[in-house]
């Protein structure tokens, strides 16, 4: 089944609001807890995000089996019930990414977030070929995630965009201002631009000036109303509100996040536990916050619920 949106319609819809990247729930035995995941999606989708990205980085894609990815995507499509577009992941090598994109289309997802190739070195031309092959394997709109080894420059990205009408967006997880400026200067409104650095609220205001109108909010998982309010302040360029919340909440939160590799996901599940919506442990190779560390996000969240 094809998406309810054309790629250009999808880009317009996603770029107009905040993006939800839900965690994936696991039980004490580390099995995918689909009932808890579905219940949480019901709660999240009651808040007006512009789109939901199932089984993404915050959702521990790297720790899921392909069957679990399919189940997570189908659950997201069912539970959101058309209230917002659902974007499914594709990743690993090109053949697997193509299969994942085609599975997402069968599972009625509305678009694809294409993650970097797995465990290999590659240049911009190789990444461009990878993206093009995935785009041509599906009718769904595709957002390419620039991160790790997936480093497309403006020339390579423009070439793929010309060849693939369904390449609808670029998510930046690199943080190279020169690269992002050149990409937006060359491609302009041809693509949707998504902020994808960890704790994207930190960079939301400067990225807005580079054409990045939305971002993936992990904090939305446990403070959706706060996250929507902060996003509104960013779009309004309300510097006073933005820097107050950065100083009082976001930047102290990132200090704990940076304490250990992988805590960018672990701290989100800690935040969910702190607000009474536990999602279970993270899967290895990630590690959960210690009990002593858990007190810190609880204190930071405070009255922001």
From Swiss-Prot:
Residue ranges that the Swiss-Prot or TrEMBL entry lists as coiled coil: none
Catalytic activity reported: 5-dehydro-4-deoxy-D-glucarate + H(+) = 2,5-dioxopentanoate + CO2 + H2O
Keyword presence, Repressor: no
GO MF annotation: an example: 5-dehydro-4-deoxyglucarate dehydratase activity
Domain of life assignment: Bacteria
Pfam families documented for this protein: DHDPS
Protein name: Probable 5-dehydro-4-deoxyglucarate dehydratase
Organism encoding this protein: Xanthomonas campestris pv. campestris (strain 8004)
